[in-house]
């Protein structure tokens, strides 16, 4: 059996090293894609300036100095909405301000991916969905806020929360590259050259930073000891122990670590095991409606 893993952003040497231990040989084959030069420009954000205002100034500068559509990377839908509010009153009439994020309706996402009509320009305010998952045609200018929203385990609650952090150099390079897909482009970075050199090359792997309850429950359903599985990044021992203790407390795993009937029922729900247990245990009583409302509020947050 031959397995070919392809990615534009993977840490190839890490994959090769880990897979070589089990396969004996896992060579890296590099295929250089066609890219064009991208002019990197640094415009540091003032410490006390609101993000949407600094993004607005950068967009106006790019509209004056460069041609083509603009792709702006922001950490979340809240920042996108605020930046849109700033830009709508300050951009010329021939400029379309559109939003792109996974939380938006598909029709709006599809509209954001379509090039503007002849004679018009487009500013796409996007999350990191446009970094690797989607290609926005017609973009020759990228503006990178330099921050990202990533999941992290909250030790106080035992649940995963989203935190805003400084993005990595790898992410910045990937975002800048979006400006040079079809011709020479320009990338504005909202930080300075010195700060650029101090950024992490890569952010820590997500699986090492989040709650592992869902992962542990899924693996228990497979019936395979977790120690027999090969991971690119070693799972934190403390997080894994906490996950198994939590699943046992919820009676989703038995004393031997095997998945229970309740555990399989919870696994079928698209919820964290803690929340799924609330639903499964109260499905047939009078409070299930209240629980559904509580979960809807929690998940909306």
Mark where each language-model region is:
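P-loop NTPase motor module signature
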Residues: 1-278
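Leucine-rich, amphipathic alpha-helical/linker segments
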Residues: 272-301
């Amino acid at each position: 059996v031959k397995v070919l893993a392809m990615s534009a952003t993977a840490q190839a040497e890490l994959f090769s090293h880990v897979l070589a231990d089990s396969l004996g040989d896992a060579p890296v084959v590099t295929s250089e894609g066609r890219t064009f030069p991208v002019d990197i420009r640094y415009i540091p954000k003032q410490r006390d300036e609101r993000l949407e205002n600094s993004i607005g100034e950068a967009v106006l500068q790019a509209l004056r100095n460069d041609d083509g559509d603009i792709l702006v990377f922001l950490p979340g839908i809240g920042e996108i909405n605020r930046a849109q509010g700033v830009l709508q009153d300050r951009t010329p009439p021939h400029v379309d301000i559109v939003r792109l994020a996974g939380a938006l309706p598909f029709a709006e996402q599809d509209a954001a991916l379509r090039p503007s009509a002849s004679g018009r320009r487009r500013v796409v305010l996007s999350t990191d969905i446009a970094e690797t998952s989607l290609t926005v045609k017609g973009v020759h200018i990228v503006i990178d806020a330099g921050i990202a929203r990533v999941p992290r385990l909250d030790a106080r609650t035992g649940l995963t929360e989203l935190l805003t952090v400084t993005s990595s150099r790898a992410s910045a390079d990937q975002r800048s590259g979006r400006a040079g897909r079809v011709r020479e482009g320009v990338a504005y970075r909202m930080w300075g050259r010195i700060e650029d050199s101090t950024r992490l090359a890569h952010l820590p792997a997500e699986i090492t930073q989040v709650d592992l309850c869902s992962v542990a429950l899924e693996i228990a359903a497979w019936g395979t000891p977790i120690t027999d599985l090969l991971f690119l990044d070693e799972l934190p021992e403390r997080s894994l122990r906490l996950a198994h203790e939590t699943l046992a407390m919820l009676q989703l795993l038995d004393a031997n670590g095997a998945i229970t009937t309740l555990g399989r029922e919870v696994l079928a729900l698209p919820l964290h095991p803690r929340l799924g247990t609330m639903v499964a245990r109260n499905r047939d009583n009078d409070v299930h409606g209240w629980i559904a409302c509580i979960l809807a509020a929690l998940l909306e947050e």
